[in-house]
A protein has these predicted regions:
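Short, acidic/small-residue loops that bind anionic groups at enzyme active sites
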Residues: 50, 135-160, 214-218
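Short glycine-rich or small-residue beta-strand-to-loop segments that form or flank ligand, phosphate
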Residues: 15-24, 83-85, 118-122, 188-191
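Short glycine/serine/threonine-rich phosphate/pyrophosphate-binding segments
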Residues: 25-35, 57-58, 102-106, 120-133, ...
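Accessory alpha-helical/coil subdomains and C-terminal extensions
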Residues: 111, 122-124, 130-134, 139, ...
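A glycine- and small-aliphatic-rich helix-loop capping segment at beta-alpha/alpha-beta transitions
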Residues: 33-42, 63-70, 134-144, 161-165, ...
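Glycine-rich oxoanion-binding loops at beta->alpha junctions
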Residues: 1-10, 61-120, 127, 161-168, ...
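N-terminal phosphate-binding or glycine-rich loops at protein starts, especially the Walker A/P-loop
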Residues: 6-61
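C-terminal non-catalytic interaction/assembly regions of soluble proteins
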Residues: 266-371
């Protein structure tokens, strides 16, 4: 994919908004900062941050903050999460409120129009972009999208904001677990996020030296896992590291779901299942660590800060040139743009021919029943 040249023409885009939607991750504040500086310094635009995603647009008056240089004097660049707040509670066309499901799309569109914005930059994952694109079409909103997700599963971009930070956190966890595994001669199992994509588990597994890497895209067997652990024992290695993505299924094909305090059922618990099955069939002692939200809230890595900053600059240039309904992407070591529809219609999971799969195999990891 060739990089598309942006012509830096001054238009009549003078007032823009930013919102972050969906789950938080490292690099969001860096993106917001970059958007502000490009818009303000290059184009003399006013920039407004909308609080708590689309929820800020449903409030009356709308919940916004005018961004200034003063806003970014502190440590926002280095902080995880988003200082504007976010929301991942579902579809705005079917939004849960006071025990009911309501359509908040009209409120959001009215809120957007009340601000007299010339354009809106949305920072979100595939689900958020799908909903916001639908809102934009209905309300004739001028939007540009920036992809962010620790899962790295947004189509049409090789990298999304937040992924590198999540991998770094998972790698550090494996580093820490290795010493305790060796001390007690145990098998330590680390369960990581990623939804239906195994990018975090695969990348962190390689970086952290995992002996077993289980991802949703490649079928495995408990016997295959045990065979690997027994081979290690024969080589006088009495401890092991296993990393497993949250959407890996049981051997019978069912997903493991956990019911949380809010009543919602979400992916979680596959690590305990793997440990239980290993201990049923062997004398290997297992312990499980579920990494959870620390993958989202950690300070962003240098890679995520750089990617977010580059995305922010490019997104502002798209708005300035009235190139709406585009998504910023990273392909072939360059920032490019694609239609938002292209970004949300494709799903980016781990392919069998991914070079990192072969890398993991070459390093001796068990990664499933690969023929």
């Amino acid at each position: 994919m060739k990089s598309k040249k942006i012509n830096f023409l001054m238009g009549n885009i003078k007032k823009i908004g930013i919102l972050t939607s969906g789950g938080d991750c490292g690099g969001l504040n860096a993106a917001i900062r970059s958007i502000f500086f490009r818009a303000n310094t290059k184009y003399n635009m006013e920039v407004f941050g909308i609080r708590d995603g689309t929820i800020g647009l449903t409030k009356r008056p709308v919940d916004v903050e005018k961004l200034t240089h003063e806003t970014f004097k502190g440590y926002l660049l280095r902080q995880g999460g988003t200082f504007l707040g976010s929301n991942n509670k579902g579809n705005n066309f079917k939004f849960p409120k006071n025990g009911k499901v309501v359509d908040t799309s009209k409120l959001i569109i009215e809120g957007y129009k009340s601000l007299n914005l010339d354009g809106l930059i949305i920072i979100g994952g595939d689900g958020s972009m799908q909903i916001l694109k639908k809102l934009a079409d209905k309300g004739k909103m001028n939007i540009v999208a920036i992809p962010k997700t620790i899962d790295n599963d947004v189509g049409a971009t090789e990298n999304s904001i937040g992924f590198h930070t999540a991998v770094d956190v998972a790698t550090q966890a494996l580093d820490n677990l290795q010493s305790t595994a060796a001390s007690h001669r145990r098998s330590m199992i680390l369960e990581v996020m990623g939804r239906d994509a195994g990018h975090i588990a695969l990348n962190a597994g390689i970086a952290g030296g995992a002996d077993v890497i289980l991802i949703p895209e490649i079928k495995y067997s408990i016997n295959g896992v045990i065979k690997k652990l027994n081979e290690m024992k024969k080589n006088k290695i009495q401890h092991s590291l296993i990393i497993v993505a949250e959407a890996v299924k049981k051997e019978d094909g069912s997903k493991v779901m956990h019911k949380y305090l809010d009543g919602e059922k979400r992916l979680g618990g596959i690590g305990d299942y793997i440990a239980s099955e290993i201990m049923k069939k062997t004398e290997i002692e297992c312990r499980v660590t579920t990494l959870g939200h620390v993958q989202r809230g950690a300070p962003p890595t240098a890679n995520d800060r750089i990617l977010a900053s580059a995305f922010g600059v490019y997104a502002v240039d798209l708005l300035a040139n009235k190139k709406f309904n585009r998504m910023v992407a990273w392909n072939n070591r360059r920032v490019v743009d694609v239609a938002i529809d292209e970004g949300i219609k494709t799903y980016r999971d781990v392919q069998r021919d991914d070079p990192l799969v072969e890398t993991a195999l070459s390093l001796g990891a068990y990664i499933g029943e690969i023929k």
